[in-house]
Swiss-Prot record:
Membrane-related topology note: Multi-pass membrane protein
Classification lineage: Eukaryota, Metazoa, Ecdysozoa, Arthropoda, Hexapoda
InterPro entries named in the record: ATP_synth_F0_asu, ATP_synth_F0_asu_AS, ATP_synth_F0_asu_bact/mt, F0_ATP_A_sf
Database matches in Gene3D superfamilies: ATP synthase, F0 complex, subunit A
Biological role stated in the UniProt entry: Subunit a, of the mitochondrial membrane ATP synthase complex (F(1)F(0) ATP synthase or Complex V) that produces ATP from ADP in the presence of a proton gradient across the membrane which is generated by electron transport complexes of the respiratory chain. ATP synthase complex consist of a soluble F(1) head domain - the catalytic core - and a membrane F(1) domain - the membrane proton channel. These two domains are linked by a central stalk rotating inside the F(1) region and a stationary peripheral stalk.
Keyword vocabulary terms for this entry: ATP synthesis, CF(0), Hydrogen ion transport, Ion transport, Membrane, Mitochondrion, Mitochondrion inner membrane, Transmembrane, Transmembrane helix, Transport
Assembly mode: Component of the ATP synthase complex composed at least of ATP5F1A/subunit alpha, ATP5F1B/subunit beta, ATP5MC1/subunit c (homooctomer), MT-ATP6/subunit a, MT-ATP8/subunit 8, ATP5ME/subunit e, ATP5MF/subunit f, ATP5MG/subunit g, ATP5MK/subunit k, ATP5MJ/subunit j, ATP5F1C/subunit gamma, ATP5F1D/subunit delta, ATP5F1E/subunit epsilon, ATP5PF/subunit F6, ATP5PB/subunit b, ATP5PD/subunit d, ATP5PO/subunit OSCP.
Key word Ion transport present: yes
Source species of the chain: Rhopalosiphum padi
Listed transmembrane segments: 20-40, 70-90, 100-120, 126-146, 166-188, 193-215
Protein name, as recorded: ATP synthase F(0) complex subunit a
Similarity comment: Belongs to the ATPase A chain family.
Reactions catalysed, as given in the entry: H(+)(in) = H(+)(out)
Amino acid sequence: MTTNLFNIFDPSTTIFNLEMNWISTLLIILFMPNFLWILPNRMNWLLFKMFNMLNNEMLMLYKMKKTKSPAFLFISLFMFILLNNFFSLFPYIFSSSSHMVFSVTLAIPFWMFFIILSTCKNTKNMIAHLIPLNTPIYLAPLMTIIETMSIIIRPMSLSIRLTANLIAGHLLMTLLNFNSLMIIIIFIQMFMMIFELCVALIQSYVFSILSSLYSSE
């Protein structure tokens, strides 16, 4: 019997006394589609459809040509998070995306990159963005502080949203882990598995879309 529900997030996998837990994040390399086939298979077709959908949505955010849009960067981010979320649902695979260090490691570099880029390339618009349009002059200092704080906490809000939703789903599946062959129990567990797959997809989409939205501002 599990005495601590959070034990599911800290398995220990060692080879030659080396911690191998985070190697699971590299499993996505084995599942990326190859282009050696004359006719695309179903996996390629599904991924291309997903790429086109995300690319069209992000192009509307940036309002620029495909050749100049950084949409491919966020599509890669989406696929990386999505596959890690899916792998974390399999037994005996380390749930890397349920750890705060995983989401923070992705959110902060993206945030810093676009903050530095916008500051260097478009300094005036970056500073003007700190004060919303039609703000009274006496509220300008306060609004500047509020907007600055909202920009600073963006990577943490992205990280917490992703981690908290995945942790909640894993804990709920652990609580409903009954060793029973009753039909109702099996249907409940199947429903929870489908629900977790949907959560993994939605959270990956939200993380990548919000990252692109923050960068477009």
